[in-house]
Amino acid sequence: WEKFNQRYTRRIRSVVKREVKKFRDCGDLKKGYRLFVCEGCHDVKKVAFRCKGKFCPTCATGESQRWAEVAANDLFTVTHRHVIFTIDEGLREIFLKEKYRKELLKGLMDEAARILLDFFRKHHIQAGVVATLHTFGSQLEYNPHVHLVVTMGGLTKDGKWKDYDYFPFAMLRKYWQNAVLKLIRRPLSQWDKARVQPLLQAAYTKNAEGFYVHAPKRSRTSLKKILEYISRYMKRGPIALNRILLYDGKIVMFQYHDKRTNTDKIKTMSAEEFIGAL
């Protein structure tokens, strides 16, 4: 990390440096601790303060589990569906621009939730949605996409529950595509709009059926399981320690699941590339 930080310090966001420092200091007695003394035998035990950071695999695991439990208790015990909204690969670099990143990434969540809620409103139903943003894929590549947990039904104007278990995928995909392309242009300067226009046009032409939206008919697992899956990416770092197979000081080898082929694969990167991906 020291070499990486020294080499790319101007490009590393302050929040990243802060999280890494918290993680490296986590559990260090020199940074502070709680002292427990047994009143009977007077045995003394020091428990170091934890960082509670997202980047820390120890702290983030507990935070992830707690979030899933709290969220599950807050949601109605009705049928839910896990929906994933993705964007064209050629557009990802636009969401990396520091000048627009925050607005564009928040906009992705807002637009995905709006499209689903508008669909149910047309059927006179107020549905419930939990939206979370994920900015990376299983290979640690930058891949902003939105995960949503949506009720399969909702409340009518008179407060009664009405089931509705149907999604018109063709419509959702085109609506989502149009929403993303408009979202990208919204905050950009005229110069930046002209620069990214070829990317927008290519993404539109390449995806004649719209951007990919994945929503299994019904989840085969419980609502809590869906939330646990989502929270792993929202409350934890990009990769779990058990996926790292090898580190020799120079290279990192880790395992990932290829959803296209439904198989586990291995990827090898230099230590510098790995830190940069994180």
Segments predicted by a language model, with ranges:
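Beta->alpha loop/short-helix hinge microenvironment recognizer with preference
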Residues: 1-278
